[in-house]
């Protein structure tokens, strides 16, 4: 590159003037020429440009570097549908408590007893698992209540609930044994109208929720085998409101009156009285609400949804007492029909029997299926869709063989008379040494 003489002379003049600190007409600072970074308010940029600024101003002042304050991390907020694991929302594994209710009468002392408090403190892992499962249940069911609408298939509803539940507890159940760490406590029940319980859609189910349906949604979620069992009913026509109100009142009555040393037969009387004080007018006809007599609430054991004690929905002579440490599913079912169910329909619910005798299985497909059931579900109830998820194929023959052999129990749907309507509400309660904790209680019910 060549430079002519006038141009060279001009450059020498500029250089000489710049060395003497003189202002040059038409010259600009680096900042004015846009040579600073766009984020020129950062402390690092100020520090880098300090010498140049000092030279321009003819000063020797130094600017101190200011350290940036680290930005505070914003707490994570749950997505819609729920997908962020609870371990990220509650990093200290301290999950919300359920509703704590002090015991009454002769058990009132338990609230302040040092001995009982000590026993309570020994249950920290037990309570943490239960509260995590309960928080997952609340978040999933509240999302479901906002989003279940007529026109959806039962398969869409079930898969949405179960996928969200698995994400929240951080275990998708696709690897061997993963669903035993945490996951579904039983198949999601989606029971329409006269179907009382134990129906979950099998693969290929085409049933669509209609505007005039009454839908019972029964969800179980477990962490470490601690199953939270809670249910609600949805209806989209206000003519069913009294049916839902009756059953919700009955369940809340059962929850309120339950406690250590309470006899279950007496508790059933309180439940029946609350429920059967209602009636419901449907299409111009008034129906008394009846408690379903041949169904019961139940205790919950680790990895087993049905324990050894039952809570009837009607008054009975059962003198069994509720005891410290018991976990109960207080559920009630009300009906506009006869108040009794019969079994019938396509089976979806199954469970490995804990008391089943070992037998030599001659059918090879039954042997391999039994191994998969033990490793993935143990005694937690499962459905056909869950077998599909873990890659089991052509298993129906082997499954039926296990049922006939008494190794696996099947649970057919429970049905009231055709043309009737039924509703369900349910909570899980812990009879802790110091208080009764309604572990599944939420703002919704």
From Swiss-Prot:
<feature type="binding site">
    <location>
        <position position="198"/>
    </location>
    <ligand>
        <name>substrate</name>
    </ligand>
</feature>
<feature type="binding site">
    <location>
        <position position="298"/>
    </location>
    <ligand>
        <name>a divalent metal cation 2</name>
    </ligand>
</feature>
<dbReference type="Pfam" id="PF00557">
    <property type="entry name" value="Peptidase_M24"/>
</dbReference>
<dbReference type="InterPro" id="IPR036005">
    <property type="entry name" value="Creatinase/aminopeptidase-like"/>
</dbReference>
<dbReference type="InterPro" id="IPR002468">
    <property type="entry name" value="Pept_M24A_MAP2"/>
</dbReference>
<keyword id="KW-0378">Hydrolase</keyword>
<feature type="compositionally biased region" description="Polar residues">
    <location>
        <begin position="85"/>
        <end position="95"/>
    </location>
</feature>
<dbReference type="InterPro" id="IPR036388">
    <property type="entry name" value="WH-like_DNA-bd_sf"/>
</dbReference>
<feature type="binding site">
    <location>
        <position position="229"/>
    </location>
    <ligand>
        <name>a divalent metal cation 1</name>
    </ligand>
</feature>
<protein>
    <recommendedName>
        <fullName>Methionine aminopeptidase 2-3</fullName>
        <ecNumber>3.4.11.18</ecNumber>
    </recommendedName>
</protein>
<dbReference type="GO" id="GO:0006508">
    <property type="term" value="P:proteolysis"/>
</dbReference>
<feature type="binding site">
    <location>
        <position position="331"/>
    </location>
    <ligand>
        <name>a divalent metal cation 2</name>
    </ligand>
</feature>
<keyword id="KW-0645">Protease</keyword>
<feature type="binding site">
    <location>
        <position position="426"/>
    </location>
    <ligand>
        <name>a divalent metal cation 2</name>
    </ligand>
</feature>
<keyword id="KW-0031">Aminopeptidase</keyword>
<dbReference type="InterPro" id="IPR000994">
    <property type="entry name" value="Pept_M24"/>
</dbReference>
<feature type="compositionally biased region" description="Basic residues">
    <location>
        <begin position="60"/>
        <end position="75"/>
    </location>
</feature>
<keyword id="KW-0963">Cytoplasm</keyword>
<dbReference type="GO" id="GO:0070006">
    <property type="term" value="F:metalloaminopeptidase activity"/>
</dbReference>
<feature type="binding site">
    <location>
        <position position="218"/>
    </location>
    <ligand>
        <name>a divalent metal cation 1</name>
    </ligand>
</feature>
<dbReference type="GO" id="GO:0046872">
    <property type="term" value="F:metal ion binding"/>
</dbReference>
<dbReference type="GO" id="GO:0004239">
    <property type="term" value="F:initiator methionyl aminopeptidase activity"/>
</dbReference>
<feature type="binding site">
    <location>
        <position position="229"/>
    </location>
    <ligand>
        <name>a divalent metal cation 2</name>
    </ligand>
</feature>
<keyword id="KW-0479">Metal-binding</keyword>
<feature type="region of interest" description="Disordered">
    <location>
        <begin position="14"/>
        <end position="115"/>
    </location>
</feature>
<dbReference type="InterPro" id="IPR036390">
    <property type="entry name" value="WH_DNA-bd_sf"/>
</dbReference>
<comment type="function">
    <text>Cotranslationally removes the N-terminal methionine from nascent proteins. The N-terminal methionine is often cleaved when the second residue in the primary sequence is small and uncharged (Met-Ala-, Cys, Gly, Pro, Ser, Thr, or Val).</text>
</comment>
<dbReference type="GO" id="GO:0005737">
    <property type="term" value="C:cytoplasm"/>
</dbReference>
<feature type="binding site">
    <location>
        <position position="306"/>
    </location>
    <ligand>
        <name>substrate</name>
    </ligand>
</feature>
<feature type="binding site">
    <location>
        <position position="426"/>
    </location>
    <ligand>
        <name>a divalent metal cation 1</name>
    </ligand>
</feature>
<feature type="compositionally biased region" description="Acidic residues">
    <location>
        <begin position="38"/>
        <end position="47"/>
    </location>
</feature>
<dbReference type="InterPro" id="IPR050247">
    <property type="entry name" value="Met_Aminopeptidase_Type2"/>
</dbReference>
<dbReference type="InterPro" id="IPR001714">
    <property type="entry name" value="Pept_M24_MAP"/>
</dbReference>
<feature type="compositionally biased region" description="Basic and acidic residues">
    <location>
        <begin position="97"/>
        <end position="115"/>
    </location>
</feature>
<comment type="similarity">
    <text>Belongs to the peptidase M24A family. Methionine aminopeptidase eukaryotic type 2 subfamily.</text>
</comment>
